[in-house]
Amino acid sequence: MKSDIHPKYEAVVFNDLASGAKFLTRSTVSSDKTIEWEDGKTYPVIDVEISSESHPFYTGKQRIMDSAGRVERFNARFKGFGKK
């Protein structure tokens, strides 16, 4: 078995820039930025623009974008489709 071919797997803090939430998890990504976590230890921190804390799908704040009534037009066009 080859040695030293696997990436370093370590504890990392992910910082959600949209909501301000922080997650301590393990990952192979690394960063020069560090942060002191609640346990008093210092961990590398990765800034992410969106996570499950701020994504509309997970927060329940998703909206269906209907541009120019396309959904209504589709429903009107195929209203009786498949019925005999």
Curated annotation (Swiss-Prot):
GO terms for biological process? translation
- One example GO MF annotation: structural constituent of ribosome
Q: Where is the signal peptide?
A: none
- What is the protein named? Large ribosomal subunit protein bL31B
NCBIfam families given for it? L31, PRK01678.1
Q: Which UniProt keywords apply?
A: Ribonucleoprotein, Ribosomal protein
Q: Which domain of life is it from?
A: Bacteria
Query: Quaternary structure per UniProt?
Result: Part of the 50S ribosomal subunit.
* Family the entry assigns: Belongs to the bacterial ribosomal protein bL31 family. Type B subfamily.
Protein's UniProt keywords contain Ribosomal protein: yes
Show the Pfam families listed in the entry.
Answer: Ribosomal_L31
What are the annotated GO cellular component locations?
ribonucleoprotein complex; ribosome
